[in-house]
Amino acid sequence: MSELASMKCEACQADAPKVTDAELAELIRMIPDWSVQVRDGIMQLERVYKFKNFKLAMAFSNKLAELAEEEFHHPGIFTEWGKVTVTWWSHSIKGLHRNDFIMAAKTDQLLD
């Protein structure tokens, strides 16, 4: 289990700090299959997972939904035939928080 995946999310309020540039550089190395995207001025983590068919993609999406409910932190999930695009960001701070990196690592573990 990766160091990030073993952590729990903390409650993220609107005044919580976004990750600094130094933290971003350190944390993104821990989840190398993820990329940073900026949409509408909001920094987000994104990864595309590939599957053999829609049924497997949907099963992964459902597992991710369960994980999100357990951690009370919810991603953008776009499910299509053979592919699931997952996007993590903290809505309350309109950017990236340590929680997003924790959840990205936990999302990767769903493949195991």
Curated annotation (Swiss-Prot):
GO molecular function term, any single one: 4-alpha-hydroxytetrahydrobiopterin dehydratase activity
EC number in record: 4.2.1.96
Spans traversing the lipid bilayer: none
Catalytic activities: (4aS,6R)-4a-hydroxy-L-erythro-5,6,7,8-tetrahydrobiopterin = (6R)-L-erythro-6,7-dihydrobiopterin + H2O
Keyword vocabulary terms for this entry: Lyase
Superkingdom field: Bacteria
An annotated GO BP: tetrahydrobiopterin biosynthetic process
NCBIfam families hit by this protein: PRK00823.1-1 (NF002016)
Family as reported in the entry's similarity comment: Belongs to the pterin-4-alpha-carbinolamine dehydratase family.
HAMAP family found in the cross-reference section: Pterin_4_alpha (MF_00434)
PANTHER family: PTERIN-4-ALPHA-CARBINOLAMINE DEHYDRATASE-RELATED (PTHR42805:SF1)
Name the record gives this protein: Putative pterin-4-alpha-carbinolamine dehydratase
